[in-house]
Amino acid sequence: MAKMRVRFPTLVLLLGIVFLMAVSIGIAYGEKNVLKNHERPQEREQEERDPRQQPRPHHQEEQEREHRRESEESQEEEREQRREPRREREQEQQPQHGRREEEEEWQPRRQRPQSRREEREQEQGSSSSSRRQSGYERREQREEREQEQEQGSRSDSRRQRNPYYFSSERFQTLYRNRNGQIRVLERFDQRTNRLENLQNYRIVEFQSKPNTLILPKHSDADYILVVLNGSATITIVNPDKRQSYNLENGDALRLPAGTTSYILNPDDNQNLRVVKLAIPINNPGNFYDFYPSSSKDQQSYFSGFSKNTLEATFNTRYEEIQSILLGNEDEQEDDEQWHGQEQSHQDEGVIVRVSKEQVQELRKYAQSSSRKGKPYESGPFNLRSNKPIYSNKFGNFYEITPDRNPQAQDLDISLTFIEINEGALLLPHYNSKAIFVVVVDEGEGNYELVGIRDQQRQQDEQEVRRYSARLSEGDIFVIPAGHPISINASSNLRLLGFGINADENQRNFLAGSEDNVIRQLDREVKGLIFPGSAEDVERLIKNQQQSYFANAQPQQQQQREREGRHGRRGHISSILSTLY
């Protein structure tokens, strides 16, 4: 029992020691866990700031990036699908001419930092303002946009604004020297396909100083020439005869293709100006002049033959033929020898000076033009030989139609000469089938031509477009068939016109007391097609009492000016009455 008593306290003591050790070990382990839990947030923050301290597996990062990319793309597609119906509704509300611009600007717009809300507000504002505009304003803006596009697409903006107008700068010089020049207008169909029917017609102009001669030549084109300034003597050479005619201002003449001719300016002081309508024979739009003599500007057509052919043709040695007809062309090519030779027509070119004795000899047997009655079958005729077909105090309109002109009947060409006084207006009209090429002879003014917009651009509707230009001497403009036109003269204006396809052409005026097609409409039709009533339309038409030509200044403006002058005079008189 005593041993048991001793062992029991010892056992209890041992158990107590073990318990204390266990408690101390547990406390120590708990403190360690607390410290670890306290340090982990700091470690996580540091890991987030610098992920390289604890890198994740590479394949896990790739999967996460791919997942994010797919999520963003799907969200973008959903947003785009939600926007598409709204965009289509906005496009349907906008005018059709603005859709193409919106489509072109849509892609760049996605890249702009501007918000979608701002873009929608701008688009809705522009579409609503466009709907509020009148048809006339939309047409004006559309014309401006098309003109800007044409200006940007080509360097010559003026040419693109009006394809029917050709300034005097559009002439190309063929020959020029100190005695004059010969030049040709560019092809009518070169700038637009709207004038394809004029591809075989060209305008030629030559000017020469006093006492000069344009050398003999023939051409592979028919000509109708008109003297616009000065006087001339033209000699026409045929195989069996030679005829000379004296031409004055306004005289015209048919010159058949292949006819050899030469033109003299016999005046001592006045320059000569002649305009020709050329109709090429061999190649549409192109023609060539053939000269029997050589000069510094061209070679003789004899030089194109071989020596054997020339010797057999003239039954003479080639050396003699060369010295008489061709000249020493080798010396002409040598500049030093060329400038050392005595001055002759070969030095001057195709326009040479002549002496007064030579002028008298060339004019000895010349005939004058026909100034009364119908033109002859050959020989010159004057455009103002008959009374004008339209005339009043504001202007005169002369015309020679193909049925009255045997020379131009087979060419189906008419000739017109129009005189519009300063401040007058040639009333709006159109030609039923003739295309007119008009040359400004003298004066200044402007014209307005009405055409239909190109159907390739506007297939859903036909809208008119106005072509206008300032006119000055030497300018050319074209009046297509069926296109209404009006001409305003800011100074005394003189116009020469060549009518193409002129047989049975009819000129229809759109205003005035006579030959007015609008006036001839039925009364019921007038009330149906115009916004006003039939009575208002007829009253409006009758307001213009003039025919063909009228005052270019509106009556209302004249009345306001008269009232203004009267008001100023009345105001001054009232002041004077108070003083005296």
Swiss-Prot record:
Belongs to the 7S seed storage protein family. The lineage of its organism: Eukaryota, Viridiplantae, Streptophyta, Embryophyta, Tracheophyta. Keywords: Allergen, Glycoprotein, Seed storage protein, Signal, Storage protein. Glycans are attached at residues 229, 488. It holds the Pfam family Cupin_1. Residues 1-30 form the signal peptide. SUPFAM superfamilies: RmlC-like cupins. Residues 37-165, 549-569 are annotated as: Disordered. It comes from Lupinus angustifolius (Narrow-leaved blue lupine). Residues 164-322, 381-538 form the Cupin type-1 domain. This is Conglutin beta 3. Residues 124-133 have a biased composition (Low complexity). InterPro entries: Cupin_1 (IPR006045), RmlC-like_jellyroll (IPR014710), RmlC_Cupin_sf (IPR011051), Seed_Storage-Functional (IPR050253). Residues 37-72, 79-92, 134-145 have a biased composition (Basic and acidic residues). Seed storage protein. Accumulates during seed development and is hydrolyzed after germination to provide a carbon and nitrogen source for the developing seedling. The variability of the residues taking part of IgE-binding epitopes might be responsible of the difference in cross-reactivity among legumes. Component of globulins complexes which accumulate in seeds. Coiled coil: none annotated. One of its GO terms (molecular function) is nutrient reservoir activity.
